[in-house]
């Protein structure tokens, strides 16, 4: 690739020289992707007629360049020819000399933007590449996020390469399994291939429906314990799967057998920040889709575990604990209750553990997610004791959520020796532009240095990283993924990161969630809709009574509604939606806007960012005189009300708008689509993958207000003139969700992944210890001082 670029410079020096001059003339020291593409488009427009056709190779190079840094006389390019593949080069702006740069040299050049990165300056560099097993690495970017398939191949190949050792490892792995004091799979250590074959022959003489209870004693004498199946037929199937695996290992045989081992009956889910409860919390600061995701996830996982344990003949009650923070001053929520059963589940509880000061006092108030870092190590110790007391043993799987939950999951996994699964939901480094380079500017409010360090530790410690989309891992041809953004970066003056994460690591697995079908279903299923909510929805949308939690009364009720629901923070961009609506007389003439989010009275908010957004919303409504066309409600809606609200908007042939500047996944997008409501959602993040643009919904650029308003208006006009068009998009949205985004599919997939990776963890125990030690050192020497520097408010 470097030589091809060098040839381009030789073949067309005039174009390259002119383009570099064009960049220099803008008097900037750096360009990110969007700015660079705009600069290239401007350059093309300025070229003489007929000349632009010859700059195709240059434009292709620029189209795959994520960043340019000007360090006179050199232009430094971060070139990304494909997802996950990075090449750093610099080109002399006059001589057009081309040099490939090391990652360290690129990061040094980047530090120059903030006046650091001097030649010869001693800088701490952390590099994780040599601590990762090469055997876990994928090769093709099209396979990123499908680590399970790769791992099955590697494990099967490992067993096949030494059948005797492979058989021994599998049988040893089976002998380790116990639940509630009883052996599973094997009752002694004398089981071998011959005894397995003889037992399969014996089972073949029995009726398939023979219950396990009737053959239990015979099986015990043969060396087998519960876990093979609930009937003689299923036991025989499972044993034949093992025989096939031991005789001729293959990826399919390995997955099929391991997927039947009842190795998981207790799960710990960790989600610390925000207000975690089942009612009266959504829309509060730091509290949104993650809470909904985890509650639905826990219910689905419990159903899957219960079904799997029953099929395998194991009489054990599965249990899930959702660990979060206990907040004594709970503001009318249940966040002050230690243990809260989850509605809709049989044995899932929210376990709340408080933050404690060093002297043991309990912190009584809510704390911003950006300021909880000094509390986490003590919290992890307290949580460990509580979990062991509740479960009676260690959990079989720990699932961390967001930066704080993932770090605590790392600490617990390390101490308990349990498989660790991380779910980021959102990585802040991807949400705030140049937040790594300008980390010092964010220290007072966000403490990003501490958070990014925690993310780096947790993502490298995890056995499994679950994402909702490919975008989250590796982006697309033009935009980098959230995780990919942690590959090479710098916190100037603190440390540099090389190979911080490898998006080709098989630990990455895409498992997309869904929406709870009890609450989010098509508007057309009229007989199932909660008609008793009609007065409440009517008041919510069209009520004329004044209140501190609402502003605006819709004057023309005949117009369709543009609906948006989210937290009131900068990234969710509800104020941006209000502004683009206010600016567009065409859109205002076609539809009313309803925004559900935050508080309407700024005095009711305790979060600085939310207060700023509330003030901005009021300014926009005042400036554009929107009180007759925009309805803003500061309500916390439960799922039943939210689901019916989507359907009522669909009844009126409205749309749902998700205008976030960045959205890791977009549960509200799934909820709205599940209700049959056409969706317009940000192209930055998960919705780009969820929605087929123009087919099952529409992508919007939240930074381009005019284009977004026009696209909304175009659809509304087209749907008014041809009602079938609205129905086509609605039906396609319903079909898209049914095909790809359900909790049943999610739970099956995640449990399969957890079992395979649990076996991999057993096989590679020694190989993982080197990385673990490196991460321990990094945590003690780098993260801990940063965490202790955050004030304990």
Swiss-Prot record:
Recorded family membership: Belongs to the glycosyltransferase 1 family.
Subunit structure: Homotetramer.
Organism: Acidithiobacillus caldus (strain ATCC 51756 / DSM 8584 / KU)
Temperature and activity: Optimum temperature is 60 degrees Celsius. Remains stable after 15 minutes at 60 degrees Celsius.
Entry protein name: Sucrose synthase
Key words, A-Z: Glycosyltransferase, Transferase
Reaction equation(s) it catalyzes: an NDP-alpha-D-glucose + D-fructose = a ribonucleoside 5'-diphosphate + sucrose + H(+); ADP-alpha-D-glucose + D-fructose = sucrose + ADP + H(+)
InterPro entries: Glyco_trans_1 (IPR001296), Sucrose_synth_GT-B1 (IPR000368), Sucrose_synthase_pln/cyn (IPR012820), SUS_EPBD (IPR056736), SUS_N (IPR056735)
pH dependence (UniProt free text): Optimum pH is 5.5.
Matches recorded under Pfam families: Glycos_transf_1 (PF00534), GT-B_Sucrose_synth (PF00862), SUS_EPBD (PF24862), SUS_N (PF24861)
Role played: Catalyzes the reversible conversion of sucrose and a nucleotide disphosphate (NDP) into fructose and NDP-glucose; although the reaction is freely reversible in vitro, the physiological reaction seems to be sucrose cleavage. Unlike characterized plant enzymes prefers ADP as a cosubstrate, whereas plants prefer UDP. The KM for sucrose is 45-fold lower in the presence of ADP than UDP. Its preference for ADP over UDP suggests it may directly link sucrose and glycogen metabolism.
EC annotation from Swiss-Prot or TrEMBL: 2.4.1.13
Highest taxon listed in the record's lineage: Bacteria
Region entry GT-B glycosyltransferase, spans: 263-742
EC supergroup of this enzyme: transferase
GO-annotated biological processes: sucrose metabolic process
UniProt GO molecular function: sucrose synthase activity
Biotechnology: Could be used to synthesize NDP-sugars for large-scale glycosylation processes; its comparatively high thermostability would be useful.
């Amino acid at each position: 690739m470097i030589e091809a670029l060098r040839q381009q410079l030789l073949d067309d020096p005039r174009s390259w020289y002119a383009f570099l001059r064009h960049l220099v003339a803008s008097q900037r020291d750096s360009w990110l992707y969007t700015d660079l593409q705009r600069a290239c488009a401007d350059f093309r427009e300025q070229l003489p007629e007929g000349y632009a056709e010859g700059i195709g190779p240059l434009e292709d190079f620029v189209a795959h360049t994520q960043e340019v840094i000007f360090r006179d006389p050199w232009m430094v390019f971060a070139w990304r020819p494909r997802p996950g593949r990075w090449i750093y080069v610099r080109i002399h702006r006059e001589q057009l000399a081309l040099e490939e740069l090391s990652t360290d040299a690129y990061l040094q050049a980047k530090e120059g933007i903030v006046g650091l990165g001097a030649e010869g300056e001693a800088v701490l560099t952390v590099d994780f590449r040599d601590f990762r097993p090469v055997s876990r690495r994928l090769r093709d970017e099209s396979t990123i996020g499908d680590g399970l398939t790769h791992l099955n191949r590697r494990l099967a190949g490992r067993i096949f390469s030494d059948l005797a050792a492979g058989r021994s490892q599998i049988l040893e792995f089976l002998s380790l399994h116990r639940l509630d004091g009883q052996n599973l799979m094997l009752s002694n250590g004398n089981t071998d291939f011959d005894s397995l074959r003889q037992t399969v022959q014996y089972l073949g003489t029995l009726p398939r429906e023979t219950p396990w209870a009737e053959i239990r004693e015979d099986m015990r004498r043969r060396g087998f314990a519960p876990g093979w199946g609930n009937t003689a037929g299923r036991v025989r199937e499972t044993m034949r799967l093992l025989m096939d695996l031991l005789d001729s290992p293959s990826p399919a045989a390995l997955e099929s057998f391991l997927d039947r081992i009842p190795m998981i009956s207790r799960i710990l889910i960790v989600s610390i920040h925000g207000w975690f409860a089942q009612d009266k919390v959504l829309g509060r600061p730091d509290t949104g889709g993650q809470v909904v995701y985890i509650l639905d996830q826990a219910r689905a996982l419990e159903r899957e575990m219960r079904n799997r344990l029953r099929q395998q003949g194991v009489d054990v009650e599965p249990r899930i604990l959702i660990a979060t923070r206990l907040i004594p001053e709970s503001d009318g929520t249940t966040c002050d209750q230690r243990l809260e059963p989850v509605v809709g589940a049989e044995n899932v509880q929210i376990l709340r553990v408080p933050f404690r000061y060093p002297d043991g006092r309990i912190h009584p108030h809510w704390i911003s997610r950006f300021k909880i870092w000094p509390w986490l190590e003590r919290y992890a110790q307290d949580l460990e004791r509580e979990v062991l007391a509740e479960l009676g043993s260690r959990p079989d799987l720990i699932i961390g959520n967001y930066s704080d939950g993932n770090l605590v999951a790392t600490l617990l996994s390390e101490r308990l020796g349990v498989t660790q699964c991380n779910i980021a939901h959102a990585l802040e480094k991807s949400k705030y532009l140049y937040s790594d380079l300008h980390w010092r500017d964010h220290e007072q409010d966000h403490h990003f240095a501490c958070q990014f360090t925690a993310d780096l530790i947790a993502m490298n410690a995890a056995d499994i990283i679950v994402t909702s989309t490919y975008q989250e891992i590796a982006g697309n041809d033009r935009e980098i993924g959230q995780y990919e953004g942690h590959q090479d970066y710098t916190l100037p003056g603190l440390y540099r990161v090389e190979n911080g994460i490898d998006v080709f690591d098989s630990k990455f697995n895409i498992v997309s969630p869904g929406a709870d079908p009890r609450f989010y279903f098509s508007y057309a299923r009229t007989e199932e809709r909660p008609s008793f909510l009609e007065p409440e929805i009517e008041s919510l949308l069209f009520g004329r009574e004044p209140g501190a939690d609402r502003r605006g009364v819709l004057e023309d009720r005949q117009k369709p509604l543009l609906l948006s629901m989210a937290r009131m923070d900068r990234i969710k961009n509800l104020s941006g939606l209000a502004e683009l609506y206010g600016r567009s007389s065409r859109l205002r003439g076609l539809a009313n806007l309803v925004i559900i989010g935050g508080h309407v009275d700024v005095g009711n908010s305790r979060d600085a960012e939310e207060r700023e957004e509330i003030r901005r919303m009021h300014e926009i409504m005042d400036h554009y005189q929107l009180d007759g066309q925009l309805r803003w409600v500061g309500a916390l809606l439960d799922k039943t009300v939210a689901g019916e609200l989507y359907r009522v908007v669909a009844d009126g042939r409205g749309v749902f708008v998700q205008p976030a500047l960045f959205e890791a996944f977009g549960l509200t997008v799934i909820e709205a689509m599940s209700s049959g409501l056409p969706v317009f959602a940000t192209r930055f993040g998960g919705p780009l993958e969820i929605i087929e643009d123009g087919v099952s919904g529409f992508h919007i650029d939240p930074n381009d207000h005019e284009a977004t308003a026009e696209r909304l208006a175009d659809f509304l006009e087209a749907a008014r003139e041809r009602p079938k068009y609205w129905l086509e998009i609605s039906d396609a949205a319903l079909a898209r969700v049914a095909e790809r985004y359900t909790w049943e599919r999610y739970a099956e997939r995640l449990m399969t992944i957890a079992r395979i990776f649990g076996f991999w963890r057993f096989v590679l125990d020694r190989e993982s210890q080197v990385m673990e030690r490196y991460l321990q050192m990094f945590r003690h020497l780098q993260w801990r001082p940063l965490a202790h520097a955050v004030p304990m408010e």
